[in-house]
Amino acid sequence: MLIKLLTKVFGSRNDRTLRRMRKAVSLINAMEPEMEKLSDDELKAKTNEFRARIEKGESVESLIPEAFAVVREASKRVFGMRHFDVQLLGGMVLNDRCIAEMRTGEGKTLTATLPAYLNALSGKGVHVVTVNDYLAQRDAENNRPLFEFLGMSVGINLPGMPAPAKREAYAADITYGTNNEYGFDYLRDNMAFSPEERVQRKLHYALVDEVDSILIDEARTPLIISGPAEDSSEMYKKVNKIIPHLIRQEKEDSDTFQGEGHFSVDEKARQVNLTERGLVLIEELLVQEGIMDEGESLYSPGNIMLMHHVTAALRAHALFTRDVDYIVKDGEVIIVDEHTGRTMQGRRWSDGLHQAVEAKEGVEIQNENQTLASITFQNYFRLYEKLAGMTGTADTEAFEFSSIYKLDTVVVPTNRPMIRKDLPDLVYMTEAEKIQAIIEDIKERTANGQPVLVGTISIEKSEVVSRELTKAGIKHNVLNAKFHANEAGIVAQAGYPAAVTIATNMAGRGTDIMLGGSWQAEVAALEAPTEEQIAQIKADWQARHDAVLAAGGLHIIGTERHESRRIDNQLRGRSGRQGDPGSSRFYLSMEDALMRIFASDRVSGMMRKLGMKPGEAIEHPWVTKAIANAQRKVESRNFDIRKQLLEYDDVANDQRRAIYSQRNELLDVSDVSDTINSIREDVFKATIDAYIPPQSLEEMWDIPGLQERLKNDFDLELPIAEWLDKEPELHEETLRERILAQSIELYQRKEEVVGAEMMRHFEKGVMLQTLDSLWKEHLAAMDYLRQGIHLRGYAQKDPKQEYKRESFAMFAAMLESLKYEVISTLSKVQVRMPEEVEAMEMQRREEAERLALMQQLSHQDDDAAVAADLAAQTGERKIGRNDPCPCGSGKKYKQCHGRLS
């Protein structure tokens, strides 16, 4: 009560922020007449003037009124569009390291030009981040004329671009690209082998469009660059044949529960577990298939990899559904983003899950991957010096933005008041009744000429609604991951009178739905349109626009509630843009995933008490409240998961930053000999300590062991035992110095042969390769540690603290291994004279030619079979070992194909 009273007196924090910013808006408006008087050249010259003032020490913030006034005037001249006052407010919010919540249709793209221009003045670069390539390209091309008019360069960063083009894009003042591509470029830069290979500059200012989608929905998805691991595709196929024999166990509280299933499914946690009966059956089936020996257990240490395959196959069959979680296209399994309904080409599930789904669908199984580098979006975007974002729906997630990214959320008022009618939810007992009610609603509204947008949560659901509409004879467009290419075109025309469009989730975000359709799209479809044609198209559009307004604007139908209220609000936000009329309603059934998992008991109890008849709907504030509570439950659970993920990833992040910073320092220096000398001393000290403990008696020394170790690991053959026999007075310290001196002397002799410059280059290459190899192994070890660490809770230990402690110990051990491996590799390397190198190169070429010839002779995989075939082809007696090889290489059989048989 007291908080409400104080808010009334002083206004909310949001109100106070906007009140402060409105003073700056008044200043910008006051400058407008002055800006209008400037010629184009004078307006363009303002950019250089601002840059000069920043160089002299003025802050970027002090330029806000003038810079925003310049951009507004330039926009009027280039686009014929003037920034509204609310867009100026949005621009200031974005410059203030905040999230700007701006409703759909309020012109977020135009708003972004203000802070992008202002922050690019410092010359450090601005990254505008979008959710897909289409939007990145569209926004860059749309805004390019404005920025270039003001003397700013614009770059586009797209997947598959060559490194020089990427470097050019990043060198631009303002760069447009997708979140994935920025993250992958960061990882690739930290895997580069020369400074010239890097493409990014220092991360300065990121302006994230659809910030909720990127920083919240995708926060649990790490970006991973991986390389192929060993091939185990046959095992996935074998295990996949077994899974259909297993029966799913019903929930214990269900009417049909008998306790006879082979595996249970936890839909909330997305987990599958074998029951005791299931374990017995699967072990029998594995023995029958010859995959496991009789009498063995699936849980024995030797069968860990087999258990991994079984779990992956079970998850693929029980939790992942075709046309919901993935689609199969051109013999490939492509993931569908659960939040956007878009396909994610090139993304693969980890832990063998993708291979298990490929086996289930009978497509080619690709190799498992090993992680080479990874980062989460949470940690990537926190690397920027300055971060801001905009979206139509952020307020429900304001707490998360604040606690994880330290970003406040400011709700920017709309330019015109919102008049959309949001109707209460209708709840039906079954899915079929719900679909029927939706069809009736669509019939009724389209008969009056009202356009309808139907939002579904998966491709499968969109196709169910589509089939029913076809049966009812209603023309419609379907927009889902399968029809991704014509997305913008379908969305642009979804406002046509009586148009019916079915879209998964937020597909088509970023494209406005214009009431009456898009006249611009019609003009663009014509080749060289005349003035008369354009005038006619505009007149026709105006008539359609007025008809749709009279029919009540765009009507939104939600076929199901999403786990997150924010995504429901995004669907609603497609209607009622810029003060247009509109309406929305959600249709639910007790069979919907959200209702079944989180809200079923209370709501179905209410419905039974009310004595519902088939086809009847319940529409009651209690039900709406129960559903909202279910969504809150899911949201808070998902927030906890993301927060916990971040706490664990922060540990890895500190290590990643340390490794990447060390790696970049290494890349930027040309001479690492001082580092090599320093770590050589450390390595030899630690190695000698293992065999000659410091300050110990000679009887405790293991001289044969030390000699063997020095020979095997450092290619150093030293007669240490002889030294000690001949020089009884040789004490421990002198012995250490002599071993190290011998090692340095041997290394210097190698350097004299190849030259100092070549040796420095080689040292750097060895350090980089060893670091990358050990970091890759460390990432895998951290992953295994992370997966099992929760079990420490049973021992009354805090898993997070245990993870921090153990991962630090692993990191320290990795750094020690790095030193050892580098010195060992450099010591063991064989240096050749130029003539020897040339001879080896000739031999390598001959070997390559011989292999090429073998491939022509036979397409079989097994080279030993090639040799046997050749013997058979000659039709002669068995080839003697010293006979010429029949492949025609000119070598003896024993030195050629004979070696392989």
From Swiss-Prot:
Regulation: induction: Repressed under conditions of excess protein secretion capacity and derepressed when protein secretion becomes limiting. This is regulated by SecM.
Protein name: Protein translocase subunit SecA
Subunit architecture: Monomer and homodimer. Part of the essential Sec protein translocation apparatus which comprises SecA, SecYEG and auxiliary proteins SecDF-YajC and YidC.
Cofactors that this protein relies on: Zn(2+)
Single GO cellular component term: plasma membrane
Entry EC no(s): 7.4.2.8
Organism: Salmonella arizonae (strain ATCC BAA-731 / CDC346-86 / RSK2980)
InterPro entries, per the entry: Helicase_ATP-bd, P-loop_NTPase, SEC_C_motif, SecA, SecA_CS, SecA_DEAD, SecA_motor_DEAD, SecA_preprotein_X-link_dom
Any single GO BP term: protein transport by the Sec complex
